[in-house]
């Protein structure tokens, strides 16, 4: 069994990330608060959930030093970029949106299977505008230039959209692909 730990950054959809992973075959999943000490983290992979603000991310920056694959969703995606030398800024489009995302790297282990494009649900005010060294932009849209990014050498991935919500057409595939990375 692959054990995934969902780190709660107090986002509105965190429970959906947990539920989606819980319902997958071959996966055990736990939900933990972002104040859990890094030394207490024991998992095959981490999902850094979305959340309202970078001011309340607990130990998430420290989790990036753990030797496990990590998937950042929305705020989690942004904090990976911010901590590792990328840049985030206020986006031109804030709020909720049904967005068509173009997959720019069909070989990417996280989002490549969604190529050439997919419809997703976005809910964010800030966005990644420059990826850290070692990362590749793997998806983009008309409203956000870095919808997804990945560093396959370090198994660090991020998506700006919310794959856990029903409005995202192939969201479950993102989590299935992440579990495969963690195996």
Swiss-Prot record:
Keywords, in A-Z order: ATP-binding, Glutamine amidotransferase, GMP biosynthesis, Ligase, Nucleotide-binding, Purine biosynthesis
EC number: 6.3.5.2
Active site: 74 (nucleophile), 162, 164
Residue ranges annotated for the Glutamine amidotransferase type-1 domain, each copy included: 3-183
Any one Gene Ontology molecular-function term assigned to this protein's record: ATP binding
InterPro entries tied to this protein: Class_I_gatase-like (IPR029062), GATASE (IPR017926), GMP_synth_GATase (IPR004739), GMP_synthase_A (IPR023686)
Residue runs in coiled coils: none
CDD domains: GATase1_GMP_Synthase
Protein's UniProt keywords contain ATP-binding: yes
Pathway as given in its UniProt record: Purine metabolism; GMP biosynthesis; GMP from XMP (L-Gln route): step 1/1
A Pfam family hit: GATase
UniProt catalytic activity: XMP + L-glutamine + ATP + H2O = GMP + L-glutamate + AMP + diphosphate + 2 H(+)
PANTHER family from the UniProt entry: GMP SYNTHASE [GLUTAMINE-HYDROLYZING], GMP SYNTHASE-RELATED
Protein function: Catalyzes the synthesis of GMP from XMP.
Subunit structure: Heterodimer composed of a glutamine amidotransferase subunit (A) and a GMP-binding subunit (B).
Protein name: GMP synthase [glutamine-hydrolyzing] subunit A
Native source organism of the sequence: Halobacterium salinarum (strain ATCC 700922 / JCM 11081 / NRC-1)
């Amino acid at each position: 069994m692959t054990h995934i730990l969902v780190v709660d950054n107090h986002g509105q959809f965190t429970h959906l990330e947990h539920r989606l992973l819980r319902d997958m075959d071959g996966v055990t999943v736990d939900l933990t608060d972002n104040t859990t000490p890094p030394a207490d983290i024991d998992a095959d992979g981490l999902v850094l959930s979305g959340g309202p603000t970078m001011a309340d991310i607990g130990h998430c920056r420290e989790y990036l030093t753990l030797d496990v694959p990590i998937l950042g969703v929305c705020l989690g995606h942004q904090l990976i970029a911010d901590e590792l030398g990328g840049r985030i800024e206020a986006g031109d489009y804030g709020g909720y949106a049904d967005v068509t995302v173009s997959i720019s790297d069909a070989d990417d282990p996280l989002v490549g299977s969604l190529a050439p494009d997919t419809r997703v649900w976005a809910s964010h005010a800030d966005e990644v505008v420059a990826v850290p060294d070692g990362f590749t932009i793997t998806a983009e849209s008309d409203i956000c230039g870095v919808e997804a990014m990945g560093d396959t050498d370090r198994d660090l991935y991020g998506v700006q959209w919310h794959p856990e919500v029903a409005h995202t057409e192939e969201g479950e595939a993102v989590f299935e692909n992440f579990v495969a990375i963690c195996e």
